[in-house]
Amino acid sequence: MSKAREIRTKIASIKNTQKITRAMELVAASKMRKAQDRMAISRPYASKIRKVISHVAASHAEYPHPYLQQRENIKRVGYIIVTTDRGLCGGLNVNLFRTAIADMKKWQADNIGMDLCVIGRKGEAFFRRYGGNVLAVADHLGDAPEVQDIIGIVKVMLDQYDKQQIDAIYIATNEFVNTMVQKPLVRQLLPLKTDEEEVEGGYWDYIYEPDESKDLLEMLLVRYIESQVYQAVIENIACEQSARMVAMKNATENAGQLIDELRLIYNKARQAGITREIAEIVAGAAAVE
């Protein structure tokens, strides 16, 4: 019967773990919905500011802003890597690392160097081990970060670009497709391509008084990059919570299956013990007779 007691102890332990994973699943689901709401709110801003940049840039075609000009000889590129602070979110970070490294190897093949700015503790730990040149790290942003939280890391990368220390900036992050699907991707932030459809249409909504549109363009471009990084952070949080919710749901279901299996083993062990005891009683009675 000692085996049966051991199985009962295991079942009790797994039940406690199951309660924890179930609670984590519910918390992640709540946080995911909030992150989705923030993501939906911030998207129109980024879209509109992109159109304004296209208008202002087209109105001053004689003023080629460095953020809009493709550099001919690329010697070094920068990456902003958006990861999570915590684990227990399935393969979210691992898939992103694979995608980012695959993109980086294209530059390495041409002997082009890379600088990294990393958001999230998981990314920092990985690229410190991997050997990347990490310029800055932003972590502990929480579940509801503000734009101010990422301005510093964006400034580090933009300063490198302004000094021509790097010739292009990319961002690696996770795109929220739906609750079950999160897609890792790498896209270019700088140099920025203007919206060709808006420019060709020749339709202008804005009159600038006084005409300080050059300064406005400078400010808008910086704000746009900040908004893109912030949007990526918010979207990555939605991906994180979604992946964690699914992972905890699977863990809860697996715990239930394991409990069922252990109960079956326990019942068999208990039945075998009872059968053995009955056999011993019968044998003892027969010996007395």
From Swiss-Prot:
**Which key words are in the record?**
ATP synthesis, Cell inner membrane, Cell membrane, CF(1), Hydrogen ion transport, Ion transport, Membrane, Transport
Q: Which residues form a coiled coil?
A: none
Q: Which InterPro entries match?
A: ATP_synth_F1_ATPase_gsu (IPR035968), ATP_synth_F1_gsu (IPR000131), ATP_synth_F1_gsu_CS (IPR023632)
| GO molecular-function terms, A-Z | ATP binding; proton-transporting ATP synthase activity, rotational mechanism
Q: Does the keyword Oxidoreductase apply?
A: no
Where does this protein reside within or beyond the cell?
Cell inner membrane
Asked if the Swiss-Prot or TrEMBL record annotates the protein with the keyword Cell inner membrane, the reply is yes
Q: Which domain of life is it from?
A: Bacteria
Q: How does it sit in the membrane?
A: Peripheral membrane protein
| Cross-referenced PANTHER family | ATP SYNTHASE GAMMA CHAIN, ATP SYNTHASE SUBUNIT GAMMA, MITOCHONDRIAL
Q: Which family does it belong to?
A: Belongs to the ATPase gamma chain family.
Function, as annotated, reads:
Produces ATP from ADP in the presence of a proton gradient across the membrane. The gamma chain is believed to be important in regulating ATPase activity and the flow of protons through the CF(0) complex.
- Entry protein name: ATP synthase gamma chain
Q: Which organism is it from?
A: Coxiella burnetii (strain CbuK_Q154)
